[in-house]
């Protein structure tokens, strides 16, 4: 992250190449000392690593791994009962770019029964999606979903896209994953539905704010997995290779 005051001091800056998909913090001519600065992102570099992170946290929730973690650390040998599977599930993916599509492909390979894609454009979705919804029809796409995955960037249009009312459309057995931006989700409402058992679980790789303060109640929310915005970092070799190749192509 480059602070705005640093950007305003860079009088010779002509191109800002970001090694991230989201660049909302760098939008706006007022940020730069000189007009006409070219801004590029790395959308397309993170599908592999973030989709694998989604699958990891999703399986942890479906198989109740966080609950078993607590059980074994209390030195108990206890079967918690029913678990669930990606196989046969109905999945709603909000955001059908590189990340959402990479996840949908992997979920389909694991036997997901029906995958809905929610998008902001009228593009034709890849075959891994069984159904296509415009963002205006999000309520219909959420209804009846076993799994909801959020992969959208943080913009004015996506702020609190998942409201208290929309969380209320989910089933008691539903799980939600957010790898987009923390601003997309009403976190207070999420804490309420998790603590009251109105949905089964959630995993957040992004929060609002970031870093999440140590005293924030989100840390103590039931059936919630939190990771510190690491699903799409540069620690996977293939991600670095793709990112460097994209930079060279842009150059």
Residue spans of the language-model regions?
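C-terminal helix-to-coil terminal segments
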Residues: 37-53, 67, 210-251
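Glycine-rich NAD(P)-binding loop of Rossmann-like domains
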Residues: 68-102
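Conserved S-adenosyl-L-methionine
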Residues: 109-113, 200
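Short, well-ordered coil/turn residues at beta-beta hairpins
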Residues: 1, 19, 151-154, 178-179, ...
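Phosphate/diphosphate ligand-binding glycine-rich loop within oxidoreductases
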Residues: 1-69
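Short loop/helix-cap segments at secondary-structure boundaries that form the rim of catalytic
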Residues: 5-10, 26-34, 121-130, 213-220
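Rossmann-like adenosine-cofactor binding region
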Residues: 122-217
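Phosphate-coordination loops involved in phosphoryl transfer and adenosine-cofactor binding
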Residues: 36, 87-90, 112, 164, ...
